[in-house]
Amino acid sequence: MVLDEYMWMVIVGFIIAFVLAFSVGANDVANSFGTAVGSGVVTLRQACILASIFETIGSVLLGAKVGETIRKGIIDVNLYNNTVDLLMAGEVSAMVGSAVWQLIASFLKLPVSGTHCIVGATIGFSLVAVGAHSVQWMQLVKIVASWFISPLLSGLMSGALFLMIKFFILNKEDPVPNGLKALPVFYAATIGINVFSILFTGAPLLGLQTFPVWATALLSVGIAIVFALVVWFFVCPWMKKKIASRLKKEGALSRISEESLDKIQDEDTSVFKELPGAKGNDESVLPLTSSSPDAAVSSESVSNGNTRVPYGRAASMTNGSIRSPFSNGTFNFDGHTVKSDAHVYHTVHKDSGLYKDLLHNIHLDRVKIDRSAPENNYRILRRNNSYTCYTAAICGVPVHSTFKSSDIAMPEDSEKLVGDTVSFSKKRLRYDSYSSYCNAVAEAEIEAEEGGVEMKLAAELADPNPPQDDSLEEDKEEKDKSQVHLLFHFLQILTACFGSFAHGGNDVSNAIGPLVALWLIYQQGGVMQEASTPVWLLLYGGVGICAGLWVWGRRVIQTMGKDLTPITPSSGFTIELASAFTVVVASNIGLPISTTHCKVGSVVAVGWIRSRKAVDWRLFRNIFLAWFVTVPVAGLFSAGVMAILQYGILPYV
């Protein structure tokens, strides 16, 4: 059968296939490198470079076999024997439906399954072209089951693995000995699982599609053992020296900082003489500032009878810590009157960078000659570090240096004060490495009021009987120790690269599977598509995936690596390894599984174990709803395009 009159559909198909590959790169590649970027082991640029390399290699070596299912496993192609043009139009429609929904999901920063997109789109066009009897509905049942099986199974495996790592390594006072002992096991598991996955999938170009399962398992175990021995005899000694060097360097820097600070404090300056706890104490509680710089030399009474305390003054001393209560009064916040109705205390340790910044800022305020036009040269206070609004209240540092209308375009995670109004976006508080120094959790509720700004500040440290919760434990668990970071740093990069390689082989079929079907139908003039997948088509899909990653991939990477829950190298490695193991096991025993759903389930499970409040459950709800609507929405888009082609274009061609 000569199909030259349908050459236009092939051309349109190639264009749309690139857009589809672009959408897959923008959305699905976050599965591989989202956690690595979130934990900080690689930058976004490095992740894009590594993912581009491994996605392309994986798509060429592994993509051919996986594409068979997408082309023939969802619909009965024999029903199109006498209507080849309808099948070609259907493949174009499927690519449009899948691409549109994945681009929408990427715009919304929601990770969705590329496989489910193309399956839903294929079902959509087939319902319009032939009817319900053309669809293999069991595939749809498996997809629905995977919504629950994938995240649950992967979450359980990730949680169990992370609890083991937490118990044997992270919770130890010195995690290095146990970490070094476990390192060969981790490398062996990573290599073994991923090698088995690659061999089990089969690479037609390498002649691996005929490997029996027992040979695949034996070869994977052998390679894993070899890597374990290499790590034990070469990597572990090198890692031990590197960790010792890092700790020695950190200790030297800490001593230098302490000596420098002590030397400064010994100088005969009024600034340090007046600072509470400047000598002889490891911690000081700095009070709120007075309502204006000029009032710092004298105390005033506030409405409730408490004393307003200037810089470096204290109202009371308890157990060597100087505390200043401040309640139901007002203070000056960069020229704006701010009211507070809560007691505010804040402990600042002398060995922290925050303490030194406070000293420096106070010194600058004291030595200024011209107070008529003060300048605020402080850095922007961002929600993601220790400079929160209560820190600003303590040292008189504004949230932003100016309050002009042009300042509205600030980073979305900053708190913004604009004139007499407040633009405040409530987000989940994230703790960082400063939490070991600042053991107070503050929550700010800022409301715009006529005639000024009302700020409600609360610090749990001020409560003599604080609630017995695990907030301090969560602070400590938020960041890995430097030794743990080094142990898991390269491990997470390795698992991410393997995951990217496997993803390229699996998901390139979602991008160019319909295009391969379209090309083979056009070449052979029939619907059976007996020829093998051309390598150049796989490479074409790989290039499209990389383009999408570079242009738009950061959106979903941010969701997977940062927004859903904070990631550390240890938790990121756990997520990568457990989700990969889940995919391999579930695929081998016939359970319906989705890589995207597995990764999201692992991220949520590990995040919940590390800190009960660390998971953004609202975001997870939105992701789950996106999974739920993926198949019907992609199917509707595809069905609409198919109806236009079948009834509006093909009859007139």
Curated annotation (Swiss-Prot):
Extracellular side: 1-5, 68-86, 131-142, 209-217, 505-532, 588-594, 644-653
Biased composition range(s): Low complexity: 290-303
Transmembrane segments: 6-26, 47-67, 87-107, 110-130, 143-163, 188-208, 218-238, 484-504, 533-553, 573-587, 595-610, 623-643
Cytoplasmic side: 27-46, 108-109, 164-187, 239-483, 554-572, 611-622
Location relative to the cell: Cell membrane; Apical cell membrane
Sugar-modified residues: 81
GO biological process, one term: phosphate ion transmembrane transport
Cited Pfam families: PHO4
Region (Disordered): 275-310
Tagged with keyword Glycoprotein: yes
UniProt keywords, alphabetically: Cell membrane, Glycoprotein, Ion transport, Membrane, Phosphate transport, Receptor, Sodium, Sodium transport, Symport, Transmembrane, Transmembrane helix, Transport
GO cellular component: apical plasma membrane; brush border membrane; plasma membrane
GO MF: phosphate transmembrane transporter activity; sodium:phosphate symporter activity
Reaction(s) this enzyme catalyzes, per UniProt: 2 Na(+)(out) + phosphate(out) = 2 Na(+)(in) + phosphate(in)
Membrane topology, record value: Multi-pass membrane protein
Subunit note: Homodimer.
Function of the protein: Sodium-phosphate symporter which preferentially transports the monovalent form of phosphate with a stoichiometry of two sodium ions per phosphate ion.
Family: Belongs to the inorganic phosphate transporter (PiT) (TC 2.A.20) family.
Protein name: Sodium-dependent phosphate transporter 2
